Amino acid sequence: MTPLEIALKEYGNESFAGLPTNPDVLKYFTETGATFVHDDETPWCAAFMNWVFKQANIETPNKLLARSYENFGHPTVLQKLGDVAIFWRVTPESGLGHVGFFIRETDKLIYVLGGNEDSAVKIKPFPKTQLIGFVTY
């Protein structure tokens, strides 16, 4: 299966506010070596991507930072369905970000399938103005 197909099988998994912790979200951390994370309240977009790529036997930076995907794969400006989209949060210089699988785009928005999209695995739009770039693998 492709990484996008694996990610789609997880569609709808969500973290719970407070307790209990959803084991289907916690596995994104524990099965990729982040055993120090014990709840689903920790930001998990990068953990989700790490887990998906691990299932596809594709090596990633395996860090819990979305922007670590800037150093993954090959940069592309000809993005296709399933490529990785990387965004900044707060400010471009903050080091904070978001990462997900490219689905489609409009004039102003990029739609990605990712983890921790409003606390769930789902498709969500992000402003093109916050795009750092796309990578293919």
Name what the model sees in each region:
Residues 1-56:
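N-terminal capping segments
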